[in-house]
């Protein structure tokens, strides 16, 4: 079904596929580079923030796919009949949707990686790239499960919007993607370091 949707919306989809990495870099990476010149370890900020931009990019790509599948279609009672009547269990359907959405997010992240390595003076070796992808897969599975759980538990658009706003605040600022944990108060820093979404990124760093 995702292939069919891509085929019927090929030009807009490809346009957004390449526009999103540029937009994220222009709106987040470039301004913060002029504010935070170096990390606390003395690494140039544009190099330090590179993996964080990839994780943010994949997060932004993952959310719309799962939101539509598990919230929008559900509350508007537009679940496709062939999906509702499938002989597969609900767990398999949810897992399949998560995998497909994760693969699409990985494609966007890969395009972003190629784009950013052309702009940022960073050298990625093959082992580093493979480990980055492994950490990204674990992160997307955790984040995807969070998105799905929230989408299934909430039935009103207003509540969903507020909750997802808080989730994205956590994604942007509470995982060490853009600013280091040391900038937070000690107790809150420990909480952020040990919350599940931040662990894959910390493993890569």
Regions found by a protein language model. Name each.
Residues 90, 94-164, 169:
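Alpha-helical transmembrane segments and their short interhelical loops
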Residues 1-8, 203-204:
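A short amphipathic helical element positioned immediately N-terminal to and/or at the very start
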Residues 31-73, 134-153, 171:
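Hydrophobic alpha-helical transmembrane segments of membrane proteins
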Residues 30-32, 153-194, 198:
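Transmembrane helix segments
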Residues 8-34, 47-63, 106, 166-173:
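Hydrophobic alpha-helical transmembrane segments of multi-pass membrane transport/permease proteins
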Residues 32-41, 117-127, 185:
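Membrane-interface helix termini and inter-helical loops of multi-pass transporters
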Residues 46-118:
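Hydrophobic alpha-helical transmembrane segments of multi-pass membrane transport proteins
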């Amino acid at each position: 079904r995702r292939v069919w949707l891509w085929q019927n919306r090929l030009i807009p989809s490809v346009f957004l596929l390449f526009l999103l990495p540029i937009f994220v870099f222009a709106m987040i990476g470039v301004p913060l580079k002029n504010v935070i010149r170096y990390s606390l370890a003395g690494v140039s900020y544009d190099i330090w923030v590179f993996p964080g931009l990839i994780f943010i990019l994949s997060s932004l790509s993952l959310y719309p796919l799962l939101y539509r599948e598990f919230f929008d279609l559900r509350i508007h009672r537009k679940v496709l009949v062939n999906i509702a009547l499938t002989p597969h269990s609900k767990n398999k359907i949810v897992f399949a949707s998560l995998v497909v959405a994760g693969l699409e997010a990985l494609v966007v992240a890969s395009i972003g990686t190629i784009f950013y390595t052309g702009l940022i003076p960073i050298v990625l070796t093959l082992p580093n790239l493979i480990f980055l992808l492994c950490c990204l897969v674990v992160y997307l599975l955790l984040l995807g499960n969070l998105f799905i759980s929230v989408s299934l538990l909430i039935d009103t658009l207003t509540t969903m919007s507020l909750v997802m706003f808080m989730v994205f605040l956590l994604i942007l600022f509470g995982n060490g993607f853009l600013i280091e944990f040391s900038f937070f108060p000690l107790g809150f820093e420990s909480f952020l370091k040990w919350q599940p979404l931040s662990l894959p990124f910390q493993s890569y760093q």
